[in-house]
Amino acid sequence: GKKPILVLREPSMGPVFGMKGGATGGGYSQVVPMEDINLHFTGDFHAITAANDLLCAAIDNHIYHGNELGIETVAFNRSLDVNDRALRHVSLEHRSEKFNITAASEIMALFCLADSLDDLKEMLGNIVIGYDKNQRLILAKELHIEGALVTLLKDAFYPNLVQTLEHTPAIIHGGPFANIAHGCNSIVATKLGLSLGDYVITEAGFGSDLGAEKFLDIKCRKASIFPECIVLVATIKALKYNAGISKEDILIENVDAVREGICNLEAHVSNLKKYGVPLVVCLNAYDTDTSLEQQVVIDWCKKENISVAVST
């Protein structure tokens, strides 16, 4: 009788059209409508792109009209939600520039760490846009641009509600990359989920040494929340790959390789135990797994007194 709800990140069109593909799941573990979520969705990324590039335009316009702030080095780049190699390095009239993908924009990270529009406005104003000849930090609010930026983002700041194929509600909002940002969905979406569901499930991009630590040390601190449980997802294929098995042989039963690869799982478990939160290892089962391979993981978890579940 308990109500679960998911709170997830939005896909970026760059990976969707690249090697990684979409970010709505697969099989029966999927949020829908897949094509709408992966492509444009509600336009949140476009609003963030527009705000990002408005700030860039204001910087260059300020320099053009006399540079009263004495900007010597610009430290804020343009963005676009497409993998466009030709725009990674471009030449402007008086300096070089580059485009980041929108998910890597500082505005995307701030968008997801703000708990209100006022909070977002303050953080936008504190973006470091450059340095003067004395290496003084120059902030966006010195251009008096933060009001315009937050106005562009006011509608995008509302979270988006969709559902899984099994009709579980899913709030999808924001999408900072985890390698250069904190890799978590927005705080406002997470708090909305907490107000509506009995169990709120979210994801933190990448493993315990990156996604989990950023979620716990950055997002949770900013939002004044903390998880009741951590789920560490493992697969037999990944464990064998960590043991050095080639992709060509990874679907062949290899119990010894699973045992050898468990050292990687052990390292992630060790990282997460430091937070003192109940931990569950979830073995994401595939039909290519064998019962003997799965049993290696189950037995190891029991030996280490770690709760384990097999997802089918």
Show where each model-derived region lies.
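Flexible phosphate-sensing "switch/lid" loops adjacent to ATP/NTP-binding sites
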Residues: 1-312
